[in-house]
């Protein structure tokens, strides 16, 4: 069996076998992870943030994602764990002085070195291109290489001096195992936050009840309110009449308090003549007119 030109085909050219799985280029994958936003697929530009799983985002893209209330969000699965802006940390990155960016190959006649990175480790000097493991601190956002944290063991950040714990260290663009560990940490953190809120609620209720009790039973106040003195005749009569009433209510049987007279006071004679206890009021019926009364009752 031949073809034009006298060629004899082989069997593997005629029989189609199973398709080979296409392998992803590792260099292209690293470039995509470390130079492009996971959410918008755009080039990373400051401010750059990272989530609790160690993925890199543009802060503008995260804000737009959170503000988008539509049911179908683009690439929502990549950021489904981000519920608020508090779930991301703004990174403090150190620039690489050897990185030229687009300025080095403006004409397109040079080879682009994909291994050259924009940022480096401020301690060791390793480039953040995916060849070395990098991590950041959730408390302050400083980025270091994992080698720097292992070689210089400290409980304080090497750049800003902020204290941190092991849970605050998050690996950037880690493996599947690293992502599983970070997911378990996220769940533990959220459980702690819920328990903290539940414990705060009864404390707030107790403080509110104590404040209500204190308002109902106030203590003695030493502040004197500046009220004007009452100078009218009616108010003075009320004061004189209220003294024996209060004494009788409290069970006080002193004769002086019960039989107090206006004649004992130091007021003027004109003022004393207004009351029935004055000598001018003790006249006989013949001396006083029948239509004149000194009080609300008749003699």
Swiss-Prot record:
Pfam families: Rtf2 (PF04641). The keyword Repressor does not apply. GO terms for molecular function: DNA binding. The modification Phosphoserine is found at residue 280. Residues 195-271 are annotated as: Disordered. GO terms for cellular component: nucleus; replication fork. Its main location: nucleus. It is found in: Chromosome. InterPro entries: Rtf2, Rtf2_RING-finger. Keywords: Chromosome, Phosphoprotein. GO terms for biological process: cellular response to hydroxyurea; mitotic DNA replication termination; regulation of DNA stability. Residues 226-240 have a biased composition (Basic and acidic residues). Undergoes proteasomal degradation, via DDI1 and DDI2. Removal from stalled replisomes and degradation are required for genome stability. Belongs to the rtf2 family. Replication termination factor which is a component of the elongating replisome. Required for ATR pathway signaling upon DNA damage and has a positive activity during DNA replication. Might function to facilitate fork pausing at replication fork barriers like the rDNA. May be globally required to stimulate ATR signaling after the fork stalls or encounters a lesion. Interacts with nascent DNA. Interacts with DDI2; probably also interacts with DDI1. PANTHER family: PROTEIN C20ORF43 HOMOLOG, REPLICATION TERMINATION FACTOR 2. This is Replication termination factor 2. It comes from Bos taurus (Bovine).
């Amino acid at each position: 069996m031949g073809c034009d030109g006298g060629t004899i085909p082989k069997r593997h050219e005629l029989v189609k076998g199973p398709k080979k799985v296409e392998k992803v280029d590792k260099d292209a994958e690293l470039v995509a992870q470390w130079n492009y936003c996971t959410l918008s697929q755009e080039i990373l530009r400051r401010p750059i943030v990272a989530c609790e799983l160690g993925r890199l985002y543009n802060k503008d893209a995260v804000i737009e994602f959170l503000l988008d209330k539509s049911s179908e969000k683009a690439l929502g699965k990549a950021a489904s764990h981000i519920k608020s802006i508090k779930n991301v940390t703004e990174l403090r990155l150190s620039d690489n002085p050897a990185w030229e960016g687009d300025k080095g190959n403006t004409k397109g006649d040079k080879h682009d070195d994909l291994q050259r990175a924009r940022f480096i480790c401020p301690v060791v000097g390793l480039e953040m291109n995916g060849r070395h493991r990098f991590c950041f601190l959730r408390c302050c956002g400083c980025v270091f290489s994992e080698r720097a944290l292992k070689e210089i063991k400290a409980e304080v950040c090497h750049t800003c001096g902020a204290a941190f714990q092991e849970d605050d260290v998050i690996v950037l663009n880690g493996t599947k195992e690293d992502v599983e560990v970070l997911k378990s940490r996220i769940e533990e953190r959220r459980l702690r936050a819920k328990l903290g809120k539940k414990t705060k609620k009864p404390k707030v209720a107790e403080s509110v009840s104590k404040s209500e009790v204190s308002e109902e039973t106030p203590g003695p106040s030493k502040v004197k309110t500046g009220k004007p003195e009452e100078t009218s005749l009616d108010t003075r009569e009320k004061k004189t009449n209220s003294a024996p009433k209060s004494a009788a209510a409290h069970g006080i049987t002193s004769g002086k308090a019960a039989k107090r007279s206006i004649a004992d006071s130091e007021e003027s004679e004109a003022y004393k003549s207004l009351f029935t206890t004055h000598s001018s009021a003790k006249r006989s019926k013949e001396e006083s007119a029948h239509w004149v009364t000194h009080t609300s009752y008749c003699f």
